[in-house]
Amino acid sequence: MHSYRRAGLTFDVQDAGPREGEAVVLLHGWPQDHSAWSRVVPDLHAAGLRTLAPDQRGYSPGARPRGRAAYGMGELVDDVVALLDAAELSRAHVVGHDWGGSVAWALAERHPERVRTLTVVSTPHHHAMAWAMRHGDQLRRSWYMAAFQLPLLPELLLRGRLLGVLRRSGLPEADAQRYAARFRSLGAARGAMSWYRGLPLGELAGGLLRRGRRTSSAHPAPHRITVPTTYLWGRRDPALGRPAAERTERWVASDYRFVELDAGHWLPEREPAAVSAEVLRRVRG
């Protein structure tokens, strides 16, 4: 399949590998697209797995609705459910990086029956992130999330500056060039920035307001992840710090692996062998 539809929107998807193989859904982050996984998928295909890597809402040219509500986490999760339905898959292994990681956590939380295994790259569980915003330096690291709430200004400022930002962040040159080129289109830039104007930023803000509440690890918390889960994190990630990374395990009530790499944020592009190895390790149990 090359595309699928949901609610009048058309999503592009890269469907590759053995058709009879178990399916792995790969969810990209900001400001990436399906090509973020291009160095990861060869190892998965060689292991007999089928991969489906969509260009998500805001990134597919046919799926760029306007308005904050169109980018709420419920919509983003339902887009992935629609992909599974279109591919006639009752379940799949799910892998997500950056914002795609946020969607992967939420999918496993809301629809565990559709997720065989979960591998999240870089992004901590959202409740761990909310806790870390109240402790340590995560709030400082996440200042840009508030700045990106401004209407239109971030798009206009970043259109000519994104390449330099991505280079300085450690993204490989070819990937930085490709992502920045797409961002020069105002529609593409607006679609990508709309992720920051929806959820889960409101949930994080709510976490800040609930400063005085504590969740006891002695009692199961609601919405814990119940599927086998691996979380990969780079200790040199400038945006996502250690407190949230280490606290993520509290929100997984199934087999859990935490893999710390001596790396930064762009793990699919910079550390594809490590990512594919951990995906395969999780898929194989």
How should these model regions be labeled?
Residues 1-24, 46-49, 89-90, 253, ...:
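Alpha/beta-hydrolase fold catalytic core
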Residues 3, 51-53, 231, 258-260:
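Conserved beta-strand scaffold positions in the cores of enzyme catalytic domains, especially
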Residues 7, 17, 55, 122, ...:
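Residues at the C-termini of beta-strands that transition into short coil/loop
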Residues 9-11, 23, 36, 59-90, ...:
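Flexible "cap/lid" subdomain of the alpha/beta-hydrolase fold that forms the substrate-access gate
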Residues 14-63:
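Conserved HGGG/HGGXW glycine-rich cap/lid loop of the alpha/beta-hydrolase fold
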Residues 40, 107, 278-282:
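Hydrophobic residues on the short alpha-helix immediately C-terminal to a glycine-rich phosphate/catalytic loop
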Residues 80, 84, 275, 279, ...:
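Hydrophobic "lid"/C-terminal helical patch
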Residues 263-272:
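Catalytic histidine-centered segment of alpha/beta-hydrolase-like enzymes
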